Amino acid sequence: MEKVKAWLIKYKWWIVAAIGGLAAFLLLKNRGGGSGGGGEYMVGSGPVYQQAGSGAVDNTMALAALQANTQLSAQNAQLQAQMDASRLQLETQLNIETLAADNAHYSTQSQLQLGMAQVDLSKYLGDLQSTTSTALAGMQSDTAKYQSNIQLQAENIRANTSLAEIDAQKYIVGKQADIAKYQAKTERRGQDYGFALGLLNFGGKFF
């Protein structure tokens, strides 16, 4: 059905021309002819008058009118076909140009979006690198501070240990001195007790 419809659309003017020519032929044939009778024939858009003549002349004029109408219809059909072909060509060209423009627009939009994506990626990588560098610098600074604090604490511990050792040494020396003094005092007391005891023993001999 679609093929028949397409064929009718394609050859519609030829069909119209053929029907018009056939109708004109039948009309002129019915009106023409007869002895002494006049006939009126249409050629194109103007009448052709036959004042008087035989049936042969009428038939000749009818045939001429039919040929003229048929030729005119054929020319109109050909012109319409050319116009349809030109319109189809223009529409096809327009569709091609529109498609090319759409493709160009799509390509431009794609390139623009790709460029924007690359810019966003570069910005993201730059921000990430900056953030990473800042964080790394902070970690290095914290590590340095921590190491410095550890070292300071170690030095303080060593210093306190040295002071404790000095204090212990002083304490030991002091205790040793006290012991020596106590021993000396004890020895003196012993000597004093011995001397006193000797005196008592010596005095006892006389009494």
Swiss-Prot record:
Chain coiled-coil ranges: 64-95
Role description: Component of the phage ejection machinery. Pilot protein for the formation of the tube that conducts the genome into the target cell. Probably involved in penetration of the bacterial outer membrane and for making the peptidoglycan layer accessible to the viral transglycosylase. Essential for viral infectivity.
Gene this protein is translated from: XI
Membrane association type: Single-pass membrane protein
Chief location bin: virion
Segments crossing the lipid bilayer: 13-28
Organism annotation: Enterobacteria phage PRD1 (Bacteriophage PRD1)
Keyword terms of this UniProt record: Capsid inner membrane protein, Coiled coil, Membrane, Transmembrane, Transmembrane helix, Viral genome ejection through host cell envelope, Viral penetration into host cytoplasm, Virion, Virus entry into host cell
Name of the protein in question: Infectivity protein P11
GO BP: symbiont entry into host cell
Subcellular location: Virion membrane
This protein's GO CC annotations: membrane; viral inner membrane; virion membrane
Superkingdom of this protein's organism: Viruses
